[in-house]
């Protein structure tokens, strides 16, 4: 596995790649497993939830998503995992159905680190894709973080940046200093 450089929206050369509609992945592809491993490693190192291939300079319709486990605290203070981590490898994904209802939520992007804005998204989506084993899969009516991540990563594959979805640009703010660890941490 290898860390890849994440392209940035504020770099003109990178932005050309980030705003390009990606080509379908041709299968079988022997190099794909290594690329996917690199993408997961890069995404986790950057504390991300999703990463699309164009974010590392590859204009193919490929994305990875990692939804963290859901942990609840019990009355005695102990913690219990109520939903496991979910990892997805999305090859040639497409949204086949989307809710007419919108959900506005705070969203960021590894290609614009530290910046977040309120982005309207469909309240749920159904997505079809091919998995790493070459099988067609379907995620039905994905909501919450998974639904938002699917829409965000598929936008990347279509050359659309999350900043283009923001209706009120005054909600786009740099939180990097607020999120930086203090000397005591």
Curated annotation (Swiss-Prot):
Binds 1 Fe(2+) ion. InterPro entries: Peptide_deformylase, Peptide_deformylase_sf. CDD domains: Pep_deformylase. It is an enzyme of class 3 (hydrolase). Keywords: Hydrolase, Iron, Metal-binding, Protein biosynthesis. GO terms for biological process: co-translational protein modification; translation. The active site is at 153. Fe cation binds at residues 109, 152, 156. Removes the formyl group from the N-terminal Met of newly synthesized proteins. Requires at least a dipeptide for an efficient rate of reaction. N-terminal L-methionine is a prerequisite for activity but the enzyme has broad specificity at other positions. This is Peptide deformylase.
